[in-house]
Amino acid sequence: MTQSYASHARALMVLGLPIIGSHLAQMALHVSDTILLGRYGVTELAVGVIGGTGFFVVFILGSGFAQAVMPLVAAAVGRNDEVQVRRYARMGMWLSLAFGLMTYPLFWVSESWLLGLGQKPEVARLGQDFLRIAGWGMVPALLVMALKSYLAALGRTQVVLWTTIGAVGVNFVIAYALIFGVWGMPEMGVRGAAIASLSVQAGTFVVLAVYAGWLPELRHFHLFQRFWRPDWQALGQVFRLGWPIGVTGLMEAGLFSAVSVMMGWIGTVELASHGIAMQAAALAFMVHLGLSNAVTVRTGLAEGAGDARALRDGAKVAIAMSVAFGLVMVALFLAFPVAILSLFLDMAKPESAQIVAYGTVLLALAALFQLGDAMQVIALGLLRGIRDTRVPMWAAAFSYWVVGIPVSYVLAFRFDLGGVGLWLGLVVGLAVAAGMLMWRFWLRAPRVV
């Protein structure tokens, strides 16, 4: 039966809102760690930022296998193939486990590469202490991502939301106790933050594993029954679909990191303004990312069921919803820049006025790249739903690194546009990515006959 556009929109909202909420909660978890370490000490804050960034970069690369579980399981559900549902999920967890274990030596010797990146000796030493503990969390963090993908593909996004919200609260309590040494706990500084992170990741995995494996409505999938048995065909499919997803995420993170580094060359006020404007843009981006995850599931279900009409109509609705939200954020960024920036600043401090003045310009540019950023992440979600990841990886690489970063550099330092030039480069790179990826999806999407 043909679905109306309204029914597609409702289905996307039901699936997508909890995912959006879980992404925002995950951001809140990282922000709370930053706030606590910032109150403990400047060096510790620097360690938390650089250590957290190192962990995140490795996580992004490895998360591709976990993210590949979502479209594969969704397509299997669309085909009513329960055997493949559990096999894809298991092999996604196998690959996540293997990647997490293989990367731990990198964290064990992190002092050497932190020094190589130009960090001060004290920051590098404490950074290694942090990562030697937090690095053990890579395995549960990736397994959690795989289980979230599995549950999202089955439409069980509410549990993902509430588990993530619970993790934020538990992390804050443990981190506060161990960083500052309150309630009878030892004062451990950055090591306390690492222990809190590891504990919460492990606890979240246990909660989701129990839910996914033993909830009566899901028990018939037998997710953990004979978990040790390999399925080489399913493992190969997850691997082939997943590694380009991880590389694409790494390249996008690299684009924004490179712009941040270049902004630091310009000045401290400019870098601070950039950081705040980027935080505001990131909050808005979480909505588009949640919609992208939801549309991956919906597209996978339609593709598995062989329903080209539902697939294409669902894509149109997702694009329209993302554009509508993007236009709302454009209006807010242009109408209330000072109010938005003030949320992140103590306006009593003298330097805040300079940051707000410069940040207002950057928020106007953030309004420009909102739609491009939204369209490229929605297109990536649609392409993953039809299991197309390798060509999109190369398209993203071209857009981010051959177009975005060079344009940013030339406009900023050859045409003397400074930070404005850097952000214009982001606008151009993301717009090119959006155009190429959308063209790829509509070229590859099944035709209605």
Residue ranges and their predicted role:
Residues 107, 149, 175, 179, ...:
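Structural signal for membrane-spanning alpha-helices in multi-pass inner-membrane proteins
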Residues 66, 134-152, 160-168, 193-209, ...:
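Short runs within selected transmembrane alpha-helices of multi-pass transporters and secretion channels
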Residues 42-53, 127, 131, 194, ...:
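Small-residue hotspots at the loop-to-helix junctions and early N-terminal turns
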Residues 24-47, 115-121, 177-188, 250-283, ...:
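Helix-terminus/linker motif at the lipid-water interface of multi-pass membrane proteins
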Residues 14-33, 133, 144, 167, ...:
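Transmembrane helical elements of multi-pass membrane transporters/channels
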Residues 1-16, 73-139, 170, 186-243, ...:
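Short alpha-helical transmembrane segments in multi-pass integral membrane proteins
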Residues 47-104, 108, 141-160, 273-336, ...:
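Small-residue-rich hydrophobic transmembrane alpha-helices
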Residues 3-35, 39-40, 53-68, 72, ...:
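N-terminal transmembrane alpha-helices
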